[in-house]
Amino acid sequence: MKCEHCTRKECSKKSKTDDQENVSVDVPSPAQENEEKGEFHKLADAKIFLSDCLACDSCVTVEEGVQLSQQSAKDFFHVLNLNKRCDTSKHKVLVVSVCPQSLPYFAAKFNLSVTDASRRLCGFLKSLGVHYVFDTTIAADFSILESQKEFVRRYHQHSEEQRELPMLTSACPGWVRYAERVLGRPIIPYLCTAKSPQQVMGSLVKDYFARQQSLAPEKIFHIVVAPCYDKKLEALREGLSPTLNGARGTDCVLTSGEIAQIMEQSDLSVKDIAVDTLFGDVKEMAVRRHDGVSSDGHLAHVFRHAAKELFGEHVEEITYRALRNKDFHEVTLEKNGEVLLRFAAAYGFRNIQNMIMKLKKGKFPYHFVEVLACPRGCLNGRGQAQTEDGHTDRALLQQMEGIYSGIPVWPPESSTHVQELYQEWLEGTESPKVQEVLHTSYQSLEPCTDSLDIKW
């Protein structure tokens, strides 16, 4: 695991018994489950070490450990096999949503362009029996747009008596879990209430897409491919949504590495296929991303929007200044020598700790902070950027960063599909349904006594 104090895998500040050090969830291969050799009999058992999770501070309960064991290839193949063997009335529609930060991993892994990697991944998943493959960028569009509106509102309402700032992003599940389980009430009010891209995608698939296909939400099995293991915990946090007939938005999360392992050990002949969209027979013709070094781009897009809405300033190029280290950057909007906006990016628990200490002391001068648990951002997720011994594969990470930077940037405001969905799905940009579907709340949760890990 990574220590919040030094970001190293092993740290003397955390002591464990031998049993706790080796706590893991076994993921049997499909061949074990079926007790027969099939086309995936080569897939080795995968182990998800709970101690590797960045959000490990007494937060993984025994019940959650059991649920995490279902966030696995075993659960995915179980549904695939049921679709092959059961009566059609019991079939599930399998939908896979791929995070944009996962695509550079597949491009680097298989020496392909991002577009070709996207098509190869889509073709492979459909050859397994998946019905639809989506890109989560459209969900990030909603998350960013709602974050932009929330920041402007907070800025206007902020005062010494009613402290609304800094607004801290909430798209990183490791950081959110740490805030809820460890930091609690002093910090939670600063968390942005806009849902993460994964949560929004769950609603898009199980609500909008389900109605378009005349399907009940529970008839869809939704898998997310993501760069980090914390996304599995995020799927559990989403809970059972009343708007989705009591179903979860995301049923299963598989990391990029888990999918790559399945691909490498499969004998299937794969044909490249364009990624689907939520809009009928229309296909994704090009891969796009938001403006961020390794993230979903909340900092850059909220900064530009705030500069325009609050001060009438149009910002083209954003200059990031590294301060304490390469994972803490500052962005400012200045006019006539006065700093109008001061934003920051804080990646890794070392910078998060420094941020929290200064925030509690009232010596944190920022209006907005993009917070990510992983040093160097989402591309460095432990589900795709680590070696077998648990260290970061620096060469692979550098290659992925180069690939990611080459993907065209599209601002969320430019998506006509998003504007259509606001009207068709959410009844307008300021409707009560927007608040219900695209926003969430946070709770201060005491560390659980039945956890599979221990406190620092």
From Swiss-Prot:
Belongs to the NARF family. PANTHER family: NITRATE, FORMATE, IRON DEHYDROGENASE (PTHR11615). It comes from Rattus norvegicus (Rat). The keyword DNA-binding does not apply. One of its GO terms (cellular component) is nuclear lumen. Keywords: Nucleus, Phosphoprotein. The gene is Narf. Residues 12-36 are annotated as: Disordered. Signal peptide: none annotated. The modification Phosphoserine is found at residue 29. It comes from the Eukaryota. The lineage of its organism: Eukaryota, Metazoa, Chordata, Craniata, Vertebrata. This is Nuclear prelamin A recognition factor. InterPro entries: Cytosolic_Fe-S_CAF, Fe_hydrogenase, Fe_hydrogenase_lsu_C, Fe_hydrogenase_ssu. GO terms for molecular function: lamin binding. Interacts with LMNA and binds to the farnesylated C-terminal domain. Its main location: nucleus. The keyword Nucleotide-binding does not apply. It is found in: Nucleus.
